[in-house]
Amino acid sequence: MKPQRPQRNTLCTQKEFPLKDITERIISCAIEVHSILGPGLLENVYEEALSHEFKLRDILYERQKEITLKYKGKVVGKHRIDFMIEDKVIVELKAVEVINKIYEAQLLTYLRATNKRIGLLINFNVDLLKKGIKRLIN
């Protein structure tokens, strides 16, 4: 029988949900930013504030990291991810009314392209940030 993947946004053990500690630290930073700035701003404002919060908390990150997309060994495109945290977790930010499935698909593509396991999709345009966070597992 194939093992079940944990559902998104549920409490899981470290074995079920890898990199739980770092993702919780990232989410804590995002909650801090959201609690001060609130919803309704442009994505780049949240990106700048979150970058500053990562620095304050000594979290290693790369911002607007370029990744390469390949098809059968041929480079077919390049994209930029909002944040790569400690070379382990991809964080994509949004400031939209609704998180569409295409944003989730995009993050999963980035996870596959970089061979990373965990991604966070964070939408700051919500009243309670907890409602705007999705954890995706590759």
Per-region residue spans from a language model:
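Intrinsic disorder/low-complexity segments
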Residues: 1-21
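Nuclease catalytic cores
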Residues: 19-24, 39-43, 47, 51
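A short, surface-exposed helix-loop junction/capping segment
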Residues: 26-36
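Conserved catalytic cores of phosphodiester-cleaving nucleases, focusing on short active-site segments
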Residues: 38, 83-99, 110
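A short acidic/basic microdomain associated with nuclease active sites
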Residues: 55-70
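Nucleic-acid nuclease catalytic cores
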Residues: 94-138
